[in-house]
Amino acid sequence: MRGKIIGAALAGLWLAFSGPAGAAEPVATTDGEASGIRLAVQDLKVANGVATLRFTVLNEADTPLNYNTMRDPNNGEGGSVDGIYLIDAANKKKYLVVKDADKHCLCSRNLEHVASKSSANLWAKFPAPPDSVQKIGVVVPHFIPMDDVPISR
């Protein structure tokens, strides 16, 4: 009985990870370095010179996932996802999360953790790559990098 309940709960989490009924499928997915952690890029849209990355983290593990694993290890803001960056292989450029005048990231922040057996919808903003760039790499600390993530404009 317990196995059926856990299986049903994980199936529900996977639906949340995939988005609501009728929602578009993620444009890219990857696994975390730790077992039971996955990430799905919902979209990467460019408007007005800014790229917005929307993504979901799914924690199927038995322990919470601390957001500090996704922060910038050098100048990062605790409880944020400011360690994410984009890689433009064609132009050999790395795009970091945009920061405001107070050096706070324009990203999901003031976060604690993704609870066990749950998911979280997150976002981050970057300088827009040139119009000629149609796909880009997305690197999230402690997740396998994703190459060729499509950019919508």
Regions found by a protein language model. Give the residues of each.
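Envelope-exposed proteins and targeting segments
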Residues: 35-37, 49-53, 82, 120-122, ...
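Positively charged n-region of N-terminal signal peptides that target proteins for export
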Residues: 1-5
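N-terminal secretory signal peptides
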Residues: 24-76
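Bacterial N-terminal signal peptides
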Residues: 7-18
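Surface-exposed edge beta-strand/loop patches
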Residues: 24-30, 111-153
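The feature marks short-to-medium sequence segments in extracytoplasmic or secretory-pathway proteins
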Residues: 47, 58-111
